């Protein structure tokens, strides 16, 4: 974000403002793609217009150059142009610093950038607008300054006249014949007194001149401060004018309408707060029931995870038995009877484990069935009555669209819960059938292997 105190103007507005200030060189094409020669010429015109100093006249003055230097160096065109560009850069830096741009440098003259040139010219336009707006306020300061300058010129005239008188008396003072030493001393004393008075007058003039410069700086600072204060006061005045033009009868009527509307809204707010409290009680009851349902579903999910784990163990055991069967076939095909006995013992152990696992599986199935029946009874005996009581309480308290939405969500939860129960029953039945088929298949395979 830019930290400048003036706005960055668009090219069209910038060109219009500069041309209105008699800067005929201000063209959009030249500003968008500035060259070194173009910006130097344009800045010279700006300095000449606003500072009253022509850079070409100032830089062409031979007194600006060092007379003690070499004549060859002074007559070198490159040296002369360099000094002129440096002097122009110094003048432009001081001017742009006074109007709010403190980073002007030599690159803005030699290799100008379109964005920086646009920024510098925006500062010039802003200064021109401010100067035009505040020119009337400066009239009294300019008149006072002119008066002080006239007094200063009068003092300098008096000083020059006294200096001429001193020089005249110095030339006339000569030793004349017949004059005594005492007469010369008296004349010298008289001249010393006049010189002392002149020195005092000179010091007074210097003090007055310094006071004038300080007063001038103070007045310029006050002018700038008063200008900003005037802008702020004008803004405040415009706001107060808007308020002063307001119709008080209409304002009182609007206040009465707003008061009536406020009372109505307050009544509606109280009714809504009562409904909100009742709805919060119903929501707390519903959340309690939801947590209980979540606990039931969590128990069912835990049982399903255990069943899946057992099924995975059975699948692993099946894989092991298939591997054992394959190894057994390899041993039988090789005719090694010793390995046959070892495998027979392993097979017996696997049968024992299988029978034991079958018993545990059946016991777990019975336990899961009992748990499921218990959960169903708890749901029927505890959850359903609470849900019905909550439904009756909600229907009695509030009969709006929000409660109907909650009824619909509760019915959806019931259906989802019933669907999950049916899915669990189906999964248990499928798991039992798979286990039974697997056990029968394993027994058949073992019988075939032993036979």
From Swiss-Prot:
Residue ranges the record marks as coiled coil: 157-368
Annotated keywords: Cell cycle, Cell division, Centromere, Chromosome, Coiled coil, Kinetochore, Mitosis, Nucleus
InterPro entries for this protein: Kinetochore_Nuf2_N, Nuf2_N_sf
Keyword match Cell division: yes
GO cellular component: Ndc80 complex; nucleus
Any one biological process term the GO annotation gives: cell division
Compartmental location: Nucleus; Chromosome, Centromere, Kinetochore
Subunit structure, interactors included: Component of the NDC80 complex, which consists of NDC80, NUF2, SPC24 and SPC25.
Function statement: Acts as a component of the essential kinetochore-associated NDC80 complex, which is required for chromosome segregation and spindle checkpoint activity.
Protein name: Probable kinetochore protein NUF2
Species for this entry: Kluyveromyces lactis (strain ATCC 8585 / CBS 2359 / DSM 70799 / NBRC 1267 / NRRL Y-1140 / WM37) (Yeast)
Gene symbol of the encoding locus: NUF2
């Amino acid at each position: 974000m830019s930290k400048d105190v003036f706005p960055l103007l668009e090219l069209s507005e910038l060109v219009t403002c500069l041309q209105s200030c008699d800067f005929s060189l201000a063209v959009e094409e030249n500003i968008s793609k500035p060259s070194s020669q173009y910006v130097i010429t344009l800045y010279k015109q700006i300095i000449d217009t606003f500072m009253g100093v022509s850079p070409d006249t100032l830089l062409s003055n031979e007194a600006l150059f060092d007379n003690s230097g070499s004549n060859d160096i002074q007559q070198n065109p490159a040296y002369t142009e360099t000094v002129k560009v440096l002097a122009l850069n110094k003048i432009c830096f001081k001017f742009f610093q006074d109007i709010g741009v403190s980073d002007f440098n030599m690159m803005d003259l030699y290799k100008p950038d379109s964005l920086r040139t646009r920024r510098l010219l925006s500062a010039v336009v802003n200064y021109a607008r401010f100067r035009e707006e505040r020119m009337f306020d400066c009239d009294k300061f300019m008149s006072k300054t002119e008066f002080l300058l006239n007094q200063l010129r009068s003092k300098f005239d008096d000083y020059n006249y006294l200096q001429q008188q001193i020089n005249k008396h110095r030339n006339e003072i000569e030793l004349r014949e017949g004059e005594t030493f005492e007469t010369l001393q008296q004349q010298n004393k008289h001249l010393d007194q006049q010189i002392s008075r002149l020195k005092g007058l000179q010091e007074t003039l210097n003090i007055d001149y310094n006071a004038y410069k300080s007063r001038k700086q103070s007045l310029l600072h006050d002018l700038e401060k008063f200008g900003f204060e005037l802008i702020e006061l004008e803004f405040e005045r415009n706001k107060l004018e808007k308020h002063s033009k307001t119709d008080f009868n209409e304002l009182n009527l609007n206040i009465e309408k707003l008061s009536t509307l406020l009372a109505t809204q307050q009544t509606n707010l109280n009714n809504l707060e009562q409904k909100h409290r009742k709805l919060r009680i119903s929501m707390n009851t519903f959340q309690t029931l939801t947590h209980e349902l979540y606990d039931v579903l969590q128990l069912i999910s835990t049982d399903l995870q255990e069943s899946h784990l057992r099924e995975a163990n059975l699948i692993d055991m099946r894989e092991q038995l298939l591997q054992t069967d394959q190894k057994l076939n390899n041993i039988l095909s090789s005719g090694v009877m010793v390995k046959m006995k070892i495998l027979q013992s392993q097979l017996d152990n696997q049968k024992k484990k299988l029978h034991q696992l079958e018993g545990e599986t059946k016991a777990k199935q019975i336990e899961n069935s009992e748990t499921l029946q218990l959960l169903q009874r708890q749901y029927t005996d505890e959850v359903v009555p609470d849900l019905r009581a909550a439904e009756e309480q909600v229907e009695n308290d509030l009969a709006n669209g929000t409660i109907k939405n909650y009824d619909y969500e509760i019915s959806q939860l019931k259906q989802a819960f019933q669907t999950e129960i049916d899915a669990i029953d189906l999964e248990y039945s499928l798991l039992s059938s798979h286990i039974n088929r697997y056990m029968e298949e394993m027994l058949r395979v073992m019988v075939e292997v032993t036979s």
